[in-house]
Amino acid sequence: MLKKAKQLASQEFSRLAGREIKEEDCFVVWFSKPLPNWKALVSTNQIKSGEKCGDYAEITHNGDKKETYVDVYTKVSNRAIKD
């Protein structure tokens, strides 16, 4: 499942970036497997700022339908909020 998530993210990053983003350049940030389904958040540090390609992929597998969906996002902001 983790290998498939990285493989699918790599394919989608490569398609959107117009160049090869290797599977080994992708890493799983989060993973969950409820029942026959699973979801992984995958990222890469190979996307340069300014490239028109997201750097986070959400891979969702629907085990009942035997389908896997790939959504790609771009991190827009990251800031610390003090308690």
Question: Each predicted region: which residue ranges?
Answer:
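Short, non-transmembrane alpha-helical segments in secretory-pathway proteins
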Residues: 1-26
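Amphipathic alpha-helical interaction segments
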Residues: 21, 38-39, 81
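Amphipathic, interaction-prone secondary-structure segments
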Residues: 26-67
